[in-house]
From Swiss-Prot:
This is Actin, alpha cardiac muscle 1. The keyword Acetylation applies. It catalyses: ATP + H2O = ADP + phosphate + H(+). The modification Tele-methylhistidine is found at H75. One of its GO terms (biological process) is actin filament organization. InterPro entries: Actin, Actin/actin-like_CS, Actin_CS, ATPase_NBD. Gene3D superfamilies: 3.30.420.40, Actin, Chain A, domain 4. It is found in: Cytoplasm, Cytoskeleton.
Length: 377
């Protein structure tokens, strides 16, 4: 930690599902909370209780029974700017308790995002929060930093978007980036659907959060899907029980691995797309023939949706099947990969060589929001 917390840079990783925020130089984010804004569904009757017209993050999560929950970031793209401002305000003033006008701020975004998205981010940071300087970094690149590499292919899968980003000697190769709008939130929705087939009905935005918890606690990736299905059909060894908030206990069996299997077979949710193993392979094949070997040997996983037990072994198996037989394939799954984007941001923002990369308030005033495309790439 820097001695003077007065001028330390802030790092804010705005995920579709979780906001990770903290100070550059720390080894973990100080604040991790859901990217949710909740609004009451009912009329307040108790006068003087100080009810608010909206709740953010954990508070929205704890009062979810009476709220309608909305995620302002969908598939990595900010779709509701008013709610996003609320989330940033909450991050700075309630979670980190800092004055944003005193700290340079590093934000993150998904690769291949619309240009307007980062322009608007830049504009809000400078005009609403008056930050002295800011920067927008690509999430997958930060994950590679966090793993201590400069070359590799990152599979970054969060709540809203999954992407493969090949990076060679610190340069992302934009022509080979693959983006797949299938991630944690879609898996939660799919789990809601297949639990309905078992007779458990989850419909509201609050119940979706329960299903997300079931997914995080009980789901895993099968090494061989067909075999696992056969095992599940013939015995109850794979069944697990889960206690709902009201004390009712439900049992789930093959749903545990059918849910994340969607990552490898997107047709499960009606998506016409290759699975994550194929997009990884396709991305490597779009790179120059001389660097493929280095990419195969450095497959870095990052993001919350890569946290399923068994996912690294399955990726190893699938990519080995696609790649040339002599190729050495290595999947790197760091235990802290849930936060590796944030950790990479923390490393980047505290490098002395990075200090001239910030977009200053002065540069913004001279050039306007489009400065972000020139300074951040």
């Amino acid at each position: 930690m820097c001695d003077d917390e007065e001028t330390t840079a802030l790092v804010c990783d705005n995920g579709s599902g979780l906001v990770k925020a903290g100070f550059a130089g720390d080894d973990a984010p100080r604040a991790v909370f859901p990217s949710i804004v909740g609004r009451p569904r009912h009329q307040g009757v108790m006068v003087g209780m100080g009810q608010k017209d909206s709740y953010v993050g954990d508070e929205a999560q704890s009062k979810r029974g009476i709220l309608t929950l909305k995620y302002p970031i969908e598939h990595g793209i900010i779709t509701n700017w008013d709610d996003m401002e609320k989330i940033w305000h909450h991050t700075f003033y309630n979670e980190l308790r800092v004055a944003p006008e005193e700290h340079p701020t590093l934000l993150t975004e998904a690769p291949l995002n619309p240009k307007a998205n980062r322009e608007k981010m830049t504009q809000i940071m400078f005009e609403t929060f008056n930050v002295p300087a800011m920067y927008v970094a690509i999430q997958a690149v930060l994950s590679l930093y966090a793993s201590g590499r400069t070359t590799g292919i990152v599979l970054d899968s969060g709540d809203g978007v999954t992407h493969n980003v090949p990076i060679y000697e610190g340069y992302a190769l934009p022509h080979a980036i693959m983006r797949l709008d299938l991630a944690g939130r879609d898996l939660t929705d799919y789990l809601m659907k297949i639990l309905t087939e078992r007779g458990y009905s989850f419909v509201t935005t609050a119940e979706r959060e329960i299903v997300r918890d079931i997914k995080e606690k009980l789901c895993y990736v099968a090494l061989d899907f067909e075999n696992e299905m056969a095992t599940a059909a013939s015995s109850s060894s794979l069944e697990k029980s889960y206690e709902l908030p009201d004390g009712q206990v439900i049992t789930i069996g093959n749903e545990r691995f059918r849910c994340p299997e969607t990552l490898f077979q997107p047709s499960f949710i009606g998506m016409e797309s290759a699975g994550i193993h194929e997009t990884t392979y396709n991305s490597i094949m779009k790179c120059d023939i001389d660097i493929r070997k280095d990419l195969y040997a450095n497959n870095v996983l990052s993001g919350g949706t890569t946290m399923y037990p068994g996912i690294a072994d399955r990726m190893q198996k699938e990519i080995t099947a696609l790649a040339p037989s002599t190729m050495k394939i290595k999947i790197i799954a760091p235990p802290e990969r849930k936060y590796s984007v944030w950790i990479g941001g923390s490393i980047l923002a505290s490098l002395s060589t990075f200090q001239q990369m910030w977009i200053s308030k002065q540069e913004y005033d001279e050039a306007g929001p489009s400065i972000v495309h020139r300074k951040c790439f």
